[in-house]
C-alpha cells in the first residue's frame, strides 16, 4: 500500500481529487447505529482532520444532517470535502427533485458527485429519464460529475461505454460477497475485469463493501489489502462508527499497523436491512443454527440473535447484500 490518507487521487477524467479512503455515512444513520446528529457530525469532522476528504451519502440514507452539521462545525476551515450522493429515482421528474432535495438537505449549491443509486442489470434504459436529469443538472452547474453505483458486473461493463458517465461506484471485496451479473452471482475476478475496463475508458472508480458489510471485518487487513490494490480504483469507501475505526484506517494506510492486528468484532451482530431485503428466502437454508425466519408482519427475513453464531454464511448467500454486521 503506497497511498497515505492525505494523498489526493484524481477520479478518472474529472477534476475531482479524493483521499484513498472515503467516509460512507450510512452506518451512522437511523437504519444502523442511529447516532445523535452532533455525535455523527463530530465523527465526520474527526475523519476530515485526519486527512479524509471524501464523504458518501444517498437520498434514502437520511444522513444529511450529520454532513450539514459537520460542515457548519468546520466553518470553512481546512479543505472542502468532496461529497457524493445518490438517488433511486427512475424518471426525470423524480431525479430532478432528488437533486434539489439533496442540495437543500446538505446546504450546498453544488454536489460534487451525483449517482443513480444501485443500478441493476437492464435498468439503464428503464431509468434513462433519471439519467437525463443528472446530465441536465451537471450542465446547469448543480453537480460536477455523474454516474451510478452498482453491485452488477454487467452494469459496470455497460457504463464503461457511456460517454456522459464520469463515475462508477461498484461493489467489490476479496470474497466476492454481493457481486452480481444479471440474476446470478458473479466473482470478484469478474468485477476486477469490469473495473479495469471502465478505468481504461476514463471512468473514475471508487468502490464499496471492501469489508462485506462488516462480515469480513475479522479479516480486516486481508480485505483491505485486496481492496486497495485493485487496478483502476482511486478510492475505497468505508463506514465508520467511532473514532477507533478511523484510527485503524489511518494506521493501516500509514503502514504503522501491526501485521497481526484485526479489530475486535465480538460485540457485532448480524442484522437484516429491511430496506434492501426482498424476502427471497435464500439465507434461510444456509443457516445451520436455524436463526433466520420470515417476519409475519412483512414477509422479510429476521434473525433470532439468541441462536445466531455470527458465522456470516447468510450474508454470503444473500443476493442483494441485505445482511450486514455491525
State what each model feature region is.
Residues 31-32, 68, 90-206, 212:
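Glycine/proline-rich, positively charged
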Residues 26-38, 84-93, 216-218:
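Active-site mouth loops of central-metabolism enzymes
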Residues 79-82, 165-173, 257-263:
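Short hydrophobic/aromatic-enriched beta-strand-loop microsegments
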Residues 11, 23, 47, 55, ...:
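Conserved, mostly hydrophobic/aromatic
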Residues 53-58, 84-85, 144-148, 206-208, ...:
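Short catalytic-loop micro-motif centered on adjacent basic/acidic residues
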Residues 1-79:
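N-terminal binding-site loop/beta-alpha segment at the start of enzyme catalytic domains
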Residues 48-49, 162, 191, 195-257, ...:
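Conserved short secondary-structure transition element at the edge of the structured enzyme core
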Residues 260-279, 291-310, 324-326:
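Ferredoxin-like iron-sulfur electron-transfer modules
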Amino acid at each position: 500500500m503506497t497511498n497515505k490518507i492525505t494523498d489526493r487521487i484524481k477520479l478518472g477524467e474529472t477534476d475531482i481529487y479524493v483521499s484513498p479512503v472515503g467516509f460512507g455515512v450510512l452506518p451512522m444513520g437511523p437504519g444502523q447505529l442511529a447516532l445523535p446528529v452532533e455525535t455523527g457530525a463530530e465523527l465526520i469532522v474527526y475523519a476530515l482532520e485526519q486527512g479524509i476528504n471524501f464523504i458518501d451519502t444517498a437520498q434514502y440514507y437520511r444522513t444529511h444532517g450529520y454532513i450539514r452539521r459537520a460542515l457548519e462545525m468546520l466553518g470553512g476551515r481546512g479543505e472542502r470535502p468532496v461529497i457524493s450522493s445518490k438517488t433511486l429515482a427512475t424518471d426525470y421528474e423524480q431525479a430532478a427533485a432528488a437533486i434539489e432535495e439533496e442540495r437543500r438537505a446538505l446546504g450546498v449549491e453544488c454536489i460534487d458527485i451525483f449517482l443513480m443509486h444501485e443500478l441493476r442489470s437492464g435498468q439503464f434504459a428503464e431509468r434513462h429519464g433519471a439519467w437525463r436529469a443528472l446530465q441536465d443538472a451537471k450542465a446547469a452547474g448543480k453537480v460536477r460529475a455523474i454516474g451510478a453505483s452498482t453491485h452488477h458486473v454487467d452494469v459496470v461493463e455497460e457504463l464503461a461505454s457511456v460517454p456522459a458517465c464520469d463515475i462508477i461506484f461498484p461493489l467489490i471485496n476479496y470474497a466476492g460477497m454481493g457481486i452480481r451479473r444479471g440474476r446470478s452471482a458473479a466473482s470478484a475476478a469478474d468485477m476486477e475485469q469490469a473495473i479495469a475496463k471502465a478505468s481504461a475508458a476514463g471512468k473514475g472508480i471508487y468502490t464499496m463493501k471492501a469489508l462485506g458489510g462488516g462480515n469480513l471485518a475479522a479479516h480486516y487487513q486481508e480485505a483491505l489489502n485486496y481492496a486497495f490494490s485493485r487496478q483502476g480504483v482511486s478510492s475505497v469507501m468505508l463506514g465508520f462508527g467511532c473514532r477507533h475505526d478511523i484510527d485503524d484506517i489511518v494506521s493501516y494506510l500509514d503502514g504503522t499497523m501491526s501485521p497481526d492486528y484485526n479489530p475486535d468484532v465480538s460485540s457485532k451482530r448480524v442484522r437484516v436491512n429491511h430496506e434492501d431485503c426482498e424476502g427471497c428466502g435464500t439465507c434461510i437454508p444456509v443457516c445451520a443454527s436455524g436463526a433466520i425466519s420470515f417476519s409475519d408482519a412483512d414477509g422479510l427475513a429476521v434473525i433470532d440473535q439468541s441462536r445466531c453464531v455470527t458465522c456470516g454464511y447468510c450474508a454470503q448467500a444473500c443476493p442483494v447484500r441485505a445482511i450486514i454486521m455491525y
